[in-house]
């Protein structure tokens, strides 16, 4: 069988481009192999690596990035679907060049948490418990809904709160939940949950900075109330 007709699937696993990328990283592959992973299949006449080698013999990387679908389909074996895949990859690369990451929101006080969360929580009909995961500069890395419904210690378990904290390499956590009644005064259950999570954070070396309860146009900081120490 001719080499260019050997299906990629029939190659030894250690020689397949996708498996090599997973094992050794994308930098270990040739341009034709990388493009082959994108296109996935060749034609009846040749395998995908042979097809990609022909494409790259006709267009260098720069030229390929600028070729539109109409031009790409002039290459034998490249239909509209494959041409669209190539165009999409290079368009993503162009967008990466101009991408500017939005600055992370920094939390300096309970008032900052209230300003951020109140517009989204004021009309909630059920209690929603949310955690904000922060970096060492108190910038928000991630926001996550932990539970919906009446807050109690059996629902809000430290495992659920700190799992994401560890995955995000968070330095600290701020907890937020709402009181649909409009009164942000902490209940006995609120205090118990807070104390349980503070102790869990100490064991893992993750600071619980505060637990903010949001009511109707006002809030309570359990740190200010002395329950977060």
Curated annotation (Swiss-Prot):
One GO BP annotation of this record: proteolysis
Keywords (A to Z) from UniProt: Hydrolase, Metal-binding, Metalloprotease, Protease, Zinc
Binding sites annotated in the UniProt record for Zn(2+): 177, 179, 190
Membrane-spanning residues: none
GO molecular function: metal ion binding; metallopeptidase activity
Record bears the keyword Protease: yes
Domain spans labelled MPN: 106-228
Pfam families: RadC, UPF0758_N
Motif, JAMM motif: chain positions: 177-190
Family: Belongs to the UPF0758 family.
Protein name, per record: UPF0758 protein MA_1979
Organism: Methanosarcina acetivorans (strain ATCC 35395 / DSM 2834 / JCM 12185 / C2A)
């Amino acid at each position: 069988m001719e080499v260019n007709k050997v299906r990629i699937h029939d190659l030894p696993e250690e020689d397949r481009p996708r498996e090599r990328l997973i094992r050794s990283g994308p930098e270990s592959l040739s341009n034709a192999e990388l493009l082959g992973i994108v296109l996935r299949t060749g034609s009846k006449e040749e395998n995908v690596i042979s097809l990609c080698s022909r494409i790259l013999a006709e267009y260098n990387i720069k030229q390929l990035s600028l070729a539109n679908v109409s031009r790409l389909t002039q290459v034998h074996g490249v239909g509209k679907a494959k041409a669209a895949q190539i165009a999409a990859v290079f368009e993503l690369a162009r967008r990466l060049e101009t991408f500017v990451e939005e600055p992370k929101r920094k939390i300096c006080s309970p008032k900052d948490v209230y300003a951020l969360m109140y517009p989204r929580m004021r009309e909630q009909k059920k209690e929603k418990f949310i955690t904000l995961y922060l970096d060492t500069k108190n910038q928000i890395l991630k926001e996550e809904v932990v539970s919906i419904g009446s807050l109690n210690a059996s629902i809000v378990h430290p495992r659920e709160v700190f799992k994401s904290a560890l995955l995000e390499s968070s330095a600290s956590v701020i907890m937020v939940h709402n009181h649909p009644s409009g009164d942000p005064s902490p209940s006995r259950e609120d205090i118990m949950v807070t104390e349980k999570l503070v102790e869990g954070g100490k064991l893992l070396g993750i600071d619980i900075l505060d637990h903010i309860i949001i009511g109707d146009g006002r809030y309570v900081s359990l740190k200010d109330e002395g329950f977060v120490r």
